[in-house]
């Protein structure tokens, strides 16, 4: 007999197939037999992780005994996986309707859950796309959400090597990360970051190297990573046939001292984790311009990983994901751009650019190219079976553009309202946009993730007098 969670999951599939949006309150009247509302949260969490539904907002409950509490607003994502998952028969055999790469992501998510790590197919697909599309990936979110664990599991799943760099609060220059000249030994002493890069350069195999900077904003990255950020601007074909960046400028040392050659290469993935609290620093525009910032904000306190008695479980084979991670374009000229993508992205960013200058700086080629790369890779590797094109663009805007947006002036709040009207495609004046209006339109939005974040920022501005994407 199916468990209560599985039975409620069938109800959620039915609602996702029949309605544009629904809340957990809509599930309650459909419960029969021994099913109780206590099982709804765990079933909803599993449905979201499986890609059956996506949470697009939170509203106050309409049930008298729960009056005032917030409940999620859900809808079926516009992806092949979501459509199939709404069908009970197809849900048992997703490989019949999705690409092999999408199936590998589904299997990898199941493997992570057996290893004790909960995440959704959307989160996993998004992180893998961002690893391939940009030099830097920054994972943000509350402490304890598994930011560091996610990269460790991904590295293990694709046969990669993880280099763990623990950032210290007293790091004030590149000598702390890249190394320094020792007056005592009269030689250059590599730092933890340069050591990892040197080791990855010596690896002639096709193994991936993941360099994880844990809590990277305990110190100011623009101080201890300035040379790395600058070197990553230019790429060329190295002597070993591998794409590599310009040489990273090391701290000063006497001319007679032999310094190691340090550069980034295509087999290296730079990942930083950040917490936002009173002990950390805000990230500068120089860092945010060059990174994708993915927020692991979904915390399912009702979800538990399945029991696993096999302690020697191996990760599933993932040739499609390995191919994705090897495909790292460094220029839009290397992309096979899908039809209509440049027009869609260009028109949207042009409209947002009207307000971006006031919110954190204009949207430039770097941000546009990041969105084009994300969407192109998603379609080339058929990850659009999990994330539709509009979902990829939505995730890209939230990850590559919004992190710089902040303000406290009347002009900034007005610009924020204008950006919300643009994202929601509302033909109204910015002054007429309120948090309530924005949230009421999110269920119909083409880019709900961006709209939800902007609505939260407007609510913050209303309550506190300032707003920030963080």
Regions found by a protein language model. Name each.
Residues 34-46:
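Short amphipathic alpha-helical interaction segments
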Residues 49-58:
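A short, conserved structural fragment
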Residues 20-30:
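Short acidic, hydrophobic short linear motifs in intrinsically disordered regions
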Residues 59-82:
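Short, cationic-aromatic polyanion-contact patches
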Residues 102, 310-470:
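Alpha-helical lid/collar subdomain of P-loop NTPases
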Residues 86-323:
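AAA+ P-loop NTPase catalytic core and its hallmark functional loops
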Residues 1-14:
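Short alpha-helical segments that sit at the start of domains
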